Amino acid sequence: MGFMTQKEMAPLPDVHQLSDEQTTLTVEHLNLYYGNKQALNDISIRIPKNQVTALIGPSGCGKSTLLRCFNRMNDLVDDCRTEGDIRLNGMPINDPQLDVAVLRRRIGMVFQRPNPFPKSIYENVIYGLRLQGLRDRRLLDDAVERALRAAALWHEVKDRLSDNALTLSSGQQQRLVIARAIAIEPEVLLLDEPTSALDPISTLIVEELMGTLKQHFTLVLVTHNMQQAARVSDYTAFINQGKLIEYNRTDDLFTSPTQRRTEDYITGRFG
């Protein structure tokens, strides 16, 4: 796969030596509470630019909660509060003066199950662009083709852009959702178990797509599939009980974990 070749050709910097220029998201001493229950405990992590970072851990460990901190999806949860600092290229994400809609244009998200709108394929892709006020048909056409090509879907749908998106297969729908997310050219793409509802062939297509997308975007992936994390990610963070247990280059974490809990998890002793 292309991204494996790139990983082999260019040694990745150590997670503890990432400069600000190499970092897209910076998290420092993050705590998150649902009411009186603490879900994230003193998490500090740097997410490198133009790489795939996987968040792994057992169900309920806090990895999806952490992911949703990056675009403030947790704001939608009643009685949720956060402490600490999260920055997107230096911009404080939790600033109460920040327009969350602007943040979510800079940080796109793809969920576990494909969620295309019950509109045409074309209208799905341009949805975010229309919200931004873009009306020029030529520019919209160009954006649709560019996004669908980037999502490896263009050749499958270019002659049926007016068809309802719900007529696509589940794998095609998920790639359409990715195209919709990247059409507005975000800096970061959050992927919350994006292949868990897909068949093996569709899963492989999406995994290969991640290797291409990271050339233009920073990707953060939540996955229960450790083999998937090992295949597609450059860096992996192991989270358990709301704490960051270990964070390292993926190859190092899976072959030479420094924490016993990490080794126990990746070898199947618990989780």
UniProtKB/Swiss-Prot annotation:
- Sequence ranges assigned to domain ABC transporter in this UniProt record: 25-266
A GO cellular component annotated for this chain's UniProt record is:
plasma membrane
EC nos: 7.3.2.1
Q: What are the GO MF terms of this UniProt record?
A: ATP binding; ATP hydrolysis activity; ATPase-coupled phosphate ion transmembrane transporter activity
Main location per the UniProt record: membrane
Quote the subcellular location field of this record.
Answer: Cell inner membrane
Q: Do you know which SMART domains this protein is assigned to? A: AAA
Q: Which GO terms describe its biological process?
A: phosphate ion transmembrane transport
Q: Which PANTHER family match?
A: ABC TRANSPORTER I FAMILY MEMBER 17 (PTHR43423), IRON EXPORT ATP-BINDING PROTEIN FETA-RELATED (PTHR43423:SF12)
Q: What is this protein called?
A: Phosphate import ATP-binding protein PstB 1
Q: Which UniProt keywords apply?
A: ATP-binding, Cell inner membrane, Cell membrane, Membrane, Nucleotide-binding, Phosphate transport, Translocase, Transport
Reactions this protein catalyses? phosphate(out) + ATP + H2O = ADP + 2 phosphate(in) + H(+)
Write down the superkingdom of origin.
Bacteria
Topological type in the membrane? Peripheral membrane protein
List the Gene3D superfamilies.
P-loop containing nucleotide triphosphate hydrolases
**Mind telling me which InterPro entries this protein's record contains?**
AAA+_ATPase, ABC_transporter-like_ATP-bd, ABC_transporter-like_CS, P-loop_NTPase, PstB-like
Statement: the UniProt record of this protein carries the keyword ATP-binding: yes
Biological role: Part of the ABC transporter complex PstSACB involved in phosphate import. Responsible for energy coupling to the transport system.
The UniProt subunit note reads as follows: The complex is composed of two ATP-binding proteins (PstB), two transmembrane proteins (PstC and PstA) and a solute-binding protein (PstS).
Residues that bind ATP, according to the entry? G57, P58, S59, G60, C61, G62, K63, S64
In the record, the note on similarity to other proteins reads: Belongs to the ABC transporter superfamily. Phosphate importer (TC 3.A.1.7) family.
